[in-house]
Every structure is written in structure tokens, then in C-alpha cells.
Amino acid sequence: MSLEASFPRLRETGYRITSPATNEYNCIAWAAGESDRWWWPDPSGISYWPEGAPRQETLEAFLVAFSTVGFELCSSEVPEGGVEKVAIYVNAQGEPTHMARQLSSGEWTSKLGKSEDIEHQFDSLDGSQVYGSVAYILKRSL
């Protein structure tokens, strides 16, 4: 399935592919600023997950994991100087499915599973069948 078929709003809002496909890292690692390992709270411990964060596919576990690298809850996706923001997406059951990171330009960057990284508008992936909706915005000082 094509990128635009999976995320119909990308066609409307525009996007740019910024890297080749790779399975070296996923969207969670990319949101944390890493591109050398896969982040996921799998119970078996195969993927990296921050020490002290529950190995559960829950919003709470993701909030704890990102607090270990300096993120805290934020009320807005509006860019702020000296601040990096990430968005956590959830499906209809409230389970985390995706994360995106805000760039200094105000655009957002996402790693699409084992596919490419893209730059996109904040709401371009929101409401898709694939990732669901943004549940939380987090921020940390740069």
C-alpha cells in the first residue's frame, strides 16, 4: 500500500521523504533522537526500552520511558524556542502506535515503521487508520 493511501492527509498537506527505508530503528527511537536501535516495550526484552519504564504497550509506559530522556507533558504542538516536542499517537483502544518529533522549522518528522523517514505537517498522520490520533504532546529543553 502506498504512503498516500495509508495516510490520505499527506497528499493534502504535503510531505517529503528524508531517508531511505531501514529496519535499524523505529518511530519511537526516532522521536527520542536515536537512529541506531529499535525502541519498543516488548516483554521479552529484545528491543531497547529505558530502564525503569514498564515493558507494557500503554500510554503510561511511554510517558515514563520518555521522562527518562527528559520529556514532560505539554499542552500544545506550537513550536517553542529551545524546546523539542514529540507526539504520541494511539489507536482506538488507546494503545500507542506511533511517535513523531518536531523539528526546529516547526515541521514534524516521522519514521514509518521499517520504511522511510518523512517530514510532514503536525496533523498529516492524525486520524489515519494506521496510527490513529495524537494522545499527548511531550516536550524537553534542548
Where are these regions (language model features)?
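...with weaker cross-activation on analogous glycine-rich loops/strands in unrelated enzymes
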Residues: 53-115
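Aromatic- and glycine-rich peptidoglycan recognition patches
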Residues: 102-142
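Short amphipathic alpha-helical surface micro-motifs
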Residues: 10-14, 68-70, 115-120
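Domain-length accessory/inserted modules outside core catalytic folds
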Residues: 21, 37, 45-48, 59, ...
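Ribonuclease/tRNase effector modules and their secretory precursors
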Residues: 1-9, 15-16
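Generic structural motif recognizing short loop/turn segments at the entrances and edges of beta-strands
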Residues: 11-13, 26, 82-86, 105-106, ...
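Cysteine-nucleophile protease catalytic domains, especially the papain-like/related folds used
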Residues: 12-65
